[in-house]
UniProtKB/Swiss-Prot annotation:
GO terms for molecular function: oxidoreductase activity. Keywords: NADP, Oxidoreductase. CDD domains: AKR_BsYcsN_EcYdhF-like. The keyword Oxidoreductase applies. Its EC number is 1.-.-.-. Signal peptide: none annotated. The gene is ydhF. NADP(+) binds at residues 158-159, 209-220, 263-264. This is Oxidoreductase YdhF. It is an enzyme of class 1 (oxidoreductase). May function as oxidoreductase. Belongs to the aldo/keto reductase family. Aldo/keto reductase 2 subfamily.
Length: 298
């Protein structure tokens, strides 16, 4: 059973692995098939699900909601995360992709997510990306309104720098619950730019997206040395796959990230969560780091 973890001093409690529904529309599941998939990952202990208003051309939330309408009892077994703040050209009114973080948009987006997801509350709402035009007071006002109305229980951000995180936190009477960021052997800037250090300082756990590098890990010739090293470490750890080793590498970070799994195949979800049992040494971790970057530590 997947470990549970309190991700910030004021909560919430999530499963250590998160089921990501970004590519739900690519899985070609019927609502009944999706119910079965949800039940299977809940039974593994993966109870936290990650959404965003824009996923699947603004369709993923509603598709998930149709499944919950067929099995509404599943809602009490899960924690739902969603995001807002990006506007894409998948909607006719948007002639250009842009960010929008004003008060009314955040409230309207959250309320639409509740309708789409067939639920009366979100466990966590994130601002999807930093907005150069973000007024922190407006965002805070929207968050406080949604919190007081009971529509959203916790709030956080995604892809924010430490300064952006601190700015928004300075306007809020409650703690931001997470910063959802890209963490992977093939994407390591956050290990040194202060993002994870800030979260560790605040005892806030990051959510980690694209742990497998969005396919680059498997398809990019540049990362062949990394694949080779992962295979060696997999053998040393008796791991079932190099994917498991990558998840173990992310889990080894002291900021205690929650990896987001993006596969609609339950066998891959099952394999991913087994990474919790792998005990990666410090030297194995640094070997993987070196293989990905191509150079040793200074």
């Amino acid at each position: 059973m997947v470990q549970r973890i309190t991700i910030a001093p004021q909560g919430p409690e999530f499963s250590r692995f998160v089921m990501g529904y970004w590519r739900l529309m690519d899985w070609n599941m019927s609502a009944r098939q999706l119910v079965s998939f949800i039940e299977e990952h809940l039974d593994l202990g993966v109870t936290t699900v990650d959404h965003a208003d824009i996923y699947g051309g603004y369709q993923c939330e509603a598709a998930f909601g149709e499944a919950l309408k067929l099995a509404p009892h599943l809602r009490e077994r899960m924690e739902i995360v969603s995001k807002c703040g990006i506007a894409t050209t998948a909607r006719e009114e948007n002639v250009i992709g842009h960010y929008i973080t004003d008060r009314d948009h955040i409230i309207k987006s959250a309320e639409q997510s509740l309708i789409n997801l067939a639920t009366d509350h979100l466990d966590l709402l994130l601002i999807h990306r930093p907005d150069p035009l973000m007024d922190a007071d407006e965002v805070a006002d929207a968050f406080k309104h949604l919190h007081q109305s009971g529509k959203v229980r916790h709030f956080g951000v995604s892809n924010f720098t430490p300064a952006q995180f601190a700015l928004l936190q300075s306007r809020l009477p409650f703690t931001l619950a997470t910063n959802q960021v890209e963490i992977s052997p093939v994407h390591q800037p956050l290990l040194l730019d202060g993002t994870l250090d800030q979260l560790q300082q605040l005892r806030v756990r990051p959510m980690a997206w694209s742990c497998l590098g969005g396919g680059r890990l498997f398809n990019d010739d540049y990362f062949q040395p990394l694949r080779d090293e992962l295979a060696v470490v997999a053998e040393e750890l008796n791991a079932g796959s190099i994917e498991q080793v990558v998840y173990a590498w992310v889990l080894r970070l002291p900021s205690q990230p929650l990896p987001i799994i993006g596969s609609g195949k339950i066998e891959r979800v099952r394999a991913a969560v087994e990474a919790e049992t792998l005990k990666m040494t410090r030297q194995q971790w640094f070997r993987i780091r070196k293989a990905a970057l191509g150079y040793d530590v200074p």
